[in-house]
Amino acid sequence: MIELRKIDGDNIDEVIALDVEENQKEFILETTNLRCFADAHMLNTDGIPASPLAIYANNTMIGFLMYIYDTTDHESFQNEVYYGKKAYFIWHFMIDKRYQGKGYGKLAFEKMLADIENLPYGESQYVDLFYHKNNVIAKELYASLGFVETGIIQDNSVHAIKNLDGKITEAVVE
Protein backbone atom coordinates (compact mmCIF):
# COMPACT_ATOMS: atom_id res chain seq x y z
CA MET A 1 0.00 0.00 0.00
CA ILE A 2 1.31 3.45 -0.97
CA GLU A 3 0.98 6.32 1.48
CA LEU A 4 2.04 9.96 1.33
CA ARG A 5 3.11 11.25 4.75
CA LYS A 6 4.13 14.62 6.09
CA ILE A 7 7.78 15.09 6.86
CA ASP A 8 8.65 15.66 10.50
CA GLY A 9 11.48 15.22 12.97
CA ASP A 10 11.04 11.46 12.90
CA ASN A 11 11.55 10.98 9.16
CA ILE A 12 13.49 13.99 7.82
CA ASP A 13 16.87 12.21 7.97
CA GLU A 14 15.45 9.32 5.99
CA VAL A 15 14.12 11.73 3.34
CA ILE A 16 17.54 13.38 3.06
CA ALA A 17 19.23 9.96 2.64
CA LEU A 18 17.04 8.91 -0.32
CA ASP A 19 19.02 8.78 -3.56
CA VAL A 20 18.82 7.94 -7.25
CA GLU A 21 21.25 6.02 -9.43
CA GLU A 22 24.35 7.93 -10.54
CA ASN A 23 23.14 8.02 -14.17
CA GLN A 24 19.86 9.62 -13.02
CA LYS A 25 21.38 12.58 -11.17
CA GLU A 26 21.12 14.79 -14.27
CA PHE A 27 17.34 14.22 -14.21
CA ILE A 28 16.87 15.92 -10.86
CA LEU A 29 19.09 18.82 -11.89
CA GLU A 30 21.05 18.85 -8.65
CA THR A 31 17.84 19.46 -6.70
CA THR A 32 18.33 17.42 -3.57
CA ASN A 33 15.51 16.41 -1.27
CA LEU A 34 17.01 18.63 1.41
CA ARG A 35 16.98 21.60 -0.98
CA CYS A 36 13.34 20.88 -1.87
CA PHE A 37 12.41 20.75 1.79
CA ALA A 38 14.12 24.12 2.32
CA ASP A 39 12.30 25.49 -0.75
CA ALA A 40 9.00 24.29 0.73
CA HIS A 41 9.68 26.17 3.94
CA MET A 42 10.57 29.33 2.00
CA LEU A 43 7.53 29.06 -0.29
CA ASN A 44 5.15 28.45 2.62
CA THR A 45 6.66 31.45 4.43
CA ASP A 46 6.04 33.54 1.30
CA GLY A 47 2.40 32.43 1.15
CA ILE A 48 2.79 29.91 -1.67
CA PRO A 49 1.42 26.57 -0.45
CA ALA A 50 3.98 23.77 -0.79
CA SER A 51 3.53 20.13 0.18
CA PRO A 52 6.72 18.12 0.66
CA LEU A 53 5.73 14.52 1.31
CA ALA A 54 7.50 11.24 1.97
CA ILE A 55 6.36 8.26 -0.08
CA TYR A 56 5.88 5.00 1.82
CA ALA A 57 5.18 1.48 0.58
CA ASN A 58 4.10 -0.89 3.33
CA ASN A 59 5.56 1.41 6.01
CA THR A 60 8.96 1.68 4.27
CA MET A 61 10.01 5.08 2.94
CA ILE A 62 10.71 4.69 -0.76
CA GLY A 63 10.67 8.22 -2.13
CA PHE A 64 9.91 11.90 -1.87
CA LEU A 65 7.69 14.34 -3.72
CA MET A 66 6.67 17.94 -3.51
CA TYR A 67 3.96 19.96 -5.17
CA ILE A 68 3.00 23.62 -4.88
CA TYR A 69 0.00 25.80 -5.71
CA ASP A 70 0.83 29.02 -7.50
CA THR A 71 0.03 31.26 -10.44
CA THR A 72 1.45 30.13 -13.79
CA ASP A 73 3.06 33.44 -14.63
CA HIS A 74 6.58 32.74 -15.87
CA GLU A 75 7.37 34.63 -19.09
CA SER A 76 7.72 31.29 -20.93
CA PHE A 77 3.96 30.79 -20.60
CA GLN A 78 2.77 34.25 -21.75
CA ASN A 79 1.07 33.04 -24.93
CA GLU A 80 -0.52 29.95 -23.39
CA VAL A 81 -4.18 29.58 -22.36
CA TYR A 82 -3.12 28.67 -18.82
CA TYR A 83 -0.96 31.80 -18.35
CA GLY A 84 -1.93 33.77 -15.25
CA LYS A 85 -4.05 30.96 -13.83
CA LYS A 86 -3.61 29.11 -10.57
CA ALA A 87 -2.16 25.64 -11.00
CA TYR A 88 -0.69 22.80 -9.02
CA PHE A 89 2.95 22.30 -9.98
CA ILE A 90 4.92 19.10 -9.36
CA TRP A 91 8.14 20.53 -7.95
CA HIS A 92 9.97 17.26 -7.26
CA PHE A 93 9.30 13.55 -7.57
CA MET A 94 11.78 10.75 -6.93
CA ILE A 95 11.86 7.09 -5.97
CA ASP A 96 14.96 5.83 -4.18
CA LYS A 97 17.25 3.67 -6.32
CA ARG A 98 16.57 0.63 -4.11
CA TYR A 99 12.85 0.70 -4.94
CA GLN A 100 12.80 1.61 -8.63
CA GLY A 101 11.37 -0.74 -11.25
CA LYS A 102 8.67 -2.12 -8.93
CA GLY A 103 5.76 0.07 -10.04
CA TYR A 104 5.91 2.27 -6.95
CA GLY A 105 6.52 5.44 -8.96
CA LYS A 106 3.27 5.21 -10.89
CA LEU A 107 1.28 4.27 -7.79
CA ALA A 108 2.76 7.16 -5.80
CA PHE A 109 2.18 9.62 -8.63
CA GLU A 110 -1.44 8.49 -8.94
CA LYS A 111 -1.87 8.94 -5.18
CA MET A 112 -0.44 12.46 -5.41
CA LEU A 113 -2.73 13.33 -8.34
CA ALA A 114 -5.73 12.05 -6.36
CA ASP A 115 -4.75 14.39 -3.52
CA ILE A 116 -4.34 17.31 -5.94
CA GLU A 117 -7.72 16.58 -7.56
CA ASN A 118 -9.27 17.36 -4.15
CA LEU A 119 -7.91 20.91 -4.66
CA PRO A 120 -6.38 21.16 -1.18
CA TYR A 121 -5.16 24.75 -1.63
CA GLY A 122 -7.74 26.17 -4.02
CA GLU A 123 -9.36 25.95 -7.40
CA SER A 124 -7.36 25.03 -10.48
CA GLN A 125 -7.88 23.47 -13.87
CA TYR A 126 -4.28 22.40 -14.32
CA VAL A 127 -1.39 20.50 -12.88
CA ASP A 128 1.95 20.90 -14.59
CA LEU A 129 5.55 19.79 -14.30
CA PHE A 130 8.93 19.75 -15.95
CA TYR A 131 11.08 16.68 -16.58
CA HIS A 132 14.57 16.30 -18.03
CA LYS A 133 14.47 15.84 -21.79
CA ASN A 134 16.56 12.63 -21.56
CA ASN A 135 14.34 11.00 -18.93
CA VAL A 136 12.39 8.59 -21.13
CA ILE A 137 10.85 6.75 -18.18
CA ALA A 138 9.42 9.98 -16.74
CA LYS A 139 8.11 11.01 -20.17
CA GLU A 140 6.28 7.69 -20.56
CA LEU A 141 4.92 7.79 -17.00
CA TYR A 142 3.56 11.31 -17.32
CA ALA A 143 2.04 10.64 -20.75
CA SER A 144 0.33 7.52 -19.37
CA LEU A 145 -1.25 9.72 -16.69
CA GLY A 146 -2.62 12.26 -19.17
CA PHE A 147 0.13 14.88 -19.26
CA VAL A 148 0.67 16.56 -22.63
CA GLU A 149 3.93 18.24 -23.62
CA THR A 150 3.53 21.97 -24.29
CA GLY A 151 6.61 22.43 -26.47
CA ILE A 152 8.23 24.65 -23.83
CA ILE A 153 11.76 23.60 -22.87
CA GLN A 154 13.77 25.33 -20.14
CA ASP A 155 17.27 24.30 -19.11
CA ASN A 156 16.93 20.85 -20.76
CA SER A 157 13.57 20.31 -19.06
CA VAL A 158 10.35 19.64 -20.97
CA HIS A 159 7.12 21.22 -19.74
CA ALA A 160 3.98 19.06 -19.62
CA ILE A 161 0.48 19.87 -18.40
CA LYS A 162 -2.65 17.97 -17.44
CA ASN A 163 -6.16 19.34 -17.19
CA LEU A 164 -7.65 18.24 -13.88
CA ASP A 165 -11.03 17.57 -15.48
CA GLY A 166 -9.35 15.25 -17.98
CA LYS A 167 -10.34 17.32 -21.00
CA ILE A 168 -6.95 18.66 -22.05
CA THR A 169 -6.09 17.96 -25.65
CA GLU A 170 -3.20 18.71 -27.92
CA ALA A 171 -5.13 21.82 -29.04
CA VAL A 172 -4.76 23.40 -25.58
CA VAL A 173 -0.99 23.33 -25.86
CA GLU A 174 -0.62 24.31 -29.52
Annotated model-derived regions:
Residues 106, 132-151:
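Conserved active-site alpha-helix within GNAT-family acetyltransferase domains
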Residues 163-174:
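A cross-taxonomic marker for long C-terminal extensions/tails that follow the last structured domain
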Residues 92-94, 128-130, 161:
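Short aromatic/hydrophobic contact patches that present stacked aromatics
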Residues 2, 6-98, 111, 115-121, ...:
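Acetyl-CoA-dependent GNAT
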Residues 95, 101-115, 140, 144:
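Conserved acetyl-CoA-binding loop-helix of GNAT-fold acetyltransferases
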Residues 55, 160-162:
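Short beta-strand element of the conserved SAM-dependent methyltransferase core
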Residues 4, 101, 131:
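Conserved SAM-binding loop
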Residues 123-139, 155-158:
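Conserved beta-strand-loop-alpha-helix junction that forms the acyl-donor binding cleft
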